[in-house]
């Protein structure tokens, strides 16, 4: 089932083109990775989908609803975990989750907070202040917070940036579980290993344009110079954006 559709989305600030004629769809339970150099438009696209920003033109449908006209209807169906920790720093993890659950009027919120704390294995540090959390703990807590409202779509901006490899792998496992729950995910990332491990499809952006969107192996095949070349996703990506390493 299709949960998201972008049709000719354009974003411009004064004379600067941020996004140009972006069109793609997202299916239920699908994980899509947005790849592109800095300034490619990845975060701008996430903000438009989340409702934090608006396109100048184009159509955005979320769960079959026109997001520009009826955003309130889909607000609880969409979660957005930003790169920076924006949780209430003076609260403990549990307090922050309870606060958010009450704010969004989650039914049986105390039970659901306990359940998600257990699900994300946060029991031993649920009473720790947000400001005292490590990067990996904070990222887990933010993803858990977003899932309290049971969104159909989750947006993750650089979900494992700055984390140690072992912690990064733990975050990946949590993201993989979302797919099994039928949640559709869009991530932005600079890690090719992360994109290849997590994503069903990859979208490559450069200067606001969508250069390609397809399965990882097909993306590699498109940029393969001959059938005997052992091409990595990183090499394919660099060829797409015109910066192949020698």
How should these model regions be labeled?
Residues 129-136:
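Conserved ABC ATPase signature
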Residues 98, 102-125:
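Conserved ABC ATPase "signature" region
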Residues 213-214:
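ABC ATPase "signature
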Residues 154-157:
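Catalytic Walker B motif of ABC-type/P-loop ATPase nucleotide-binding domains
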Residues 150:
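Conserved catalytic motifs of ABC-family nucleotide-binding domains
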Residues 58-66, 73-74:
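Conserved ABC transporter NBD signature motif
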């Amino acid at each position: 089932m299709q949960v998201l559709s972008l049709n000719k989305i354009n974003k411009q600030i004064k004379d600067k083109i941020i996004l140009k004629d972006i069109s793609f769809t997202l299916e239920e339970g699908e994980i899509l990775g947005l790849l592109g150099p800095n300034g490619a438009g990845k975060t701008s696209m996430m903000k438009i989908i989340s409702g934090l920003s608006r396109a100048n033109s184009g159509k955005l449908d979320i769960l079959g609803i026109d997001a520009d006209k009826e955003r309130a209807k889909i607000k609880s169906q969409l979660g957005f975990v930003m790169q920076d920790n924006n949780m209430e720093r003076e609260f403990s993890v549990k307090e922050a989750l309870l606060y958010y659950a009450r704010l969004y009027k989650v039914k049986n919120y105390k039970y659901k907070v306990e359940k998600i704390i257990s699900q994300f294995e946060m029991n031993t540090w649920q009473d720790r202040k947000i400001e005292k959390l490590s990067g990996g703990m904070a990222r887990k807590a933010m993803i858990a917070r977003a899932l309290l409202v049971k969104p159909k779509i989750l947006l993750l901006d650089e979900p494992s940036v700055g984390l140690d490899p072992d912690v990064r792998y733990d975050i990946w496992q949590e993201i993989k579980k979302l797919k099994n729950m039928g949640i559709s995910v869009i991530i932005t990332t600079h890690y090719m290993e992360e994109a290849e491990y997590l994503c069903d499809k990859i979208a490559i952006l450069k200067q606001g344009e969508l250069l390609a969107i397809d399965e990882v192996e097909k993306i590699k095949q498109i940029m393969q110079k001959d059938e005997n070349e052992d091409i990595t996703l990183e090499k394919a990506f660099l060829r797409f954006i015109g910066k192949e390493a020698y």
